[in-house]
Amino acid sequence: MNYTPNSTEVKQLIEGVLQRHFGCSAKEASRDQMYKATAITVKNILSDKRSAYKKKVNEAGAKRVYYMCMEFLLGRSLKTNLHNLGLATAYEKALKKLGFDLEDLYECEPDAGLGNGGLGRLAACFMDSLSSLDYPATGFSICYEYGLFKQMIVDGIQVETPDVWLPGGEVWLAPRTDRTYKVRFGGRVKEEWKLDGHCEILYEDAEEIEAVPYDMMISGADSAAVSQLRLWRARNIQKFDMRLFTQGQYTQAVEQSTNAEIISKVLYPSDNHTEGKLLRLSQQYFLVSASIQSIIRDHMAVYGKLDNLPEKVAIHINDTHPALCIPELMRILVDDYFFSWEKAWDIVTRTVSYTNHTVMPEALESWNEDLFRLKLPRIYMIVKEINERFCREAWNAFPGNWSRISQMSVVGYGQVRMANISVIGSHSVNGVSELHSSILKDSTFKDFYRLYPYKFDNVTNGIAHRRWLCYSNPGLAELLDECIGTDYRHHPESLSDFAKFADDATVRDRVRAIKHDNKVKFAKMVREKTGKIIDTHSVFDVQIKRLHEYKRQLLNALNIIGLYLDLKENPDLEMQPQTFIFGAKAAPGYDMAKRIIKLLCMISKDIDQNPKIKEKLNVVFLENYSVSMAEALIPSAEISEQISLAGKEASGTGCMKLMINGALTIGTLDGANVEMQEAVGAENIFIFGLTANEVEQLWLSGYRAANYYISNDRLIRIIKYLSTGFAGESFADIAAYLLNNGHGVADPYMCLADFESYYQTHKAMIDAYANKDVWNRMSLLNIAAAGKFAADRSIEEYADRIWGLKKVK
């Protein structure tokens, strides 16, 4: 097939799809039909290209990576695919001839409801780079019918509604009903020894659910490779019960199907109750069981044996959600292919690798042992055996130290620990920034590091720089093309050449003009969607990340309240106008995160009611923040808020997207901020607050938030005003949370300890903004230093040091 059709050929392809799929001509087609027809033609090109690439991989006998993650935050596909394939211009011309505007069609596509935050966006960026670099790769996740949720803000309160994305997004999915697999839950397990010496595993009263794959193609930029993202939908194996239906028992007739299909309805269901925990566990096992069965089937079709699995397959666990792939692969090798335990374990531990994404204790997943045993009886038996053998190994390493061994065990204190089995069953364990990897070795997994020092590695995260710079910010990309050529599009380290222009006033002025144009575009989008007016001459100060206490949107809010009170006291105060922009979703069961959202929304509402204050201070909370919204916002941002409590953020990638688009960072020495400072220089980033070591020492010595409160008049004023509140609502509960939490330590993420440093650093940043030449120079140098943080670099490191992949072109 022709992978690079010209505009005439594209026009013919679209007209053909319109006729076959919708029975209409271009003149009769609606905008939605034209979008879907366009998407189908692109999907067909990608599918053919994928088939050709897969044939090359099979002929080469190349090793493949299978990347498992509970979420992939893809955003929209049409624009990225057209740019990656080099077809954007051809499609634009073809659609113009057909009476449609390509930009309008981009707006028809919903963001794919397959992800939530940084974990899913990282997975999406990595799939993009794997394709662009010609590495054989398949991603695995679940095809969530209703995504995470669609966020609505009603009177400042987050309301979760279903994210109905499939009507517009399903056009990118190819159902593979010929590749379904059975996944078993519950029941009882019996062992029956056969005369030939092998043990047959029998299941009684188990619930069987069918996993149906839906494939999405992931394009690469100017590459031979097309990666595949395989998404699983749950379907009941027991067909519709006609007998019950004819008796009028309609609900009962469909009950089994409904119960089975719940597994693939929603990403991260609330786990504040037993039912939610069971559903999450079911989702995780459903994902890994279907995926491992698929991997084994594909491998056997090419090689006919499994002894060579580690040489031909790399299975990567992205965080602990897919950790059950370790016992599931053991189950298949031992139960279905009759490998000895020792041989099977050798294969597993040379095939699987694990990336840790958090040091937060609540995110290091564990499951109630009784619940786990009831839901996954065979997997529980295997996990117990893994645990017993590991404990014997650990005893030899740490004789007599049962306390240490019990902390390292997979099963202990009534819990089954996913992080521990991930470390034990993987040949590589990596963190996602230098600081994070050090914390893993020195604290989180320190005992494992003593036992397996050779397993631990670091691969700092990266972003799909073509998407976040070239496609999202075409004005800046055009300037870079003129100044340093186009090599940076495929070799992002070449961005460093842009630093040569730091003292070129003409280039600095163009950087500033491009930023202002992007601010105008974003403000226009916000006004059209919400009616809210943003002053494009104000500083765009941006904090965009999921709402969590450790990310400290609350610290940002405290500073905003201080500015609000300054203006309330003196409306004529000379101040650089500032617009604070937030994009964040709170987990449905996370009450404090929801209160912080309400605080931000009420501050915004209060400011809207005070026109004099709004001239200099504005707060914008973006409802239902998404990837497509980020693509408009990030190029317009001038200040990037990366203010997590030091030692809590593993890496962060939003900071990298903002940096590569010329925003200046205010942040703690946490996550990737440390390496960003090294890359751009301390003089071009605004660092404040406690370090990770200082945070640890403060905890050990006894943190008392009240000490910081009583010694800071500005803080006293701000926190007292929380009780007065905004737009008629008091936030005395947040004041209490900061000062005298009745359920633990007050101010657990040290907002008060870091407040003065944050306030002074932010003030210095606004002062620097007044000197346009200095600010634009710093902005330019941030762009030039951002090449290190491209996903292409991350993937090359994974491929070389962890997966052992070779490129297939």
Regions found by a protein language model. Name each.
Residues 1-809:
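A conserved ligand/cofactor-binding region detector
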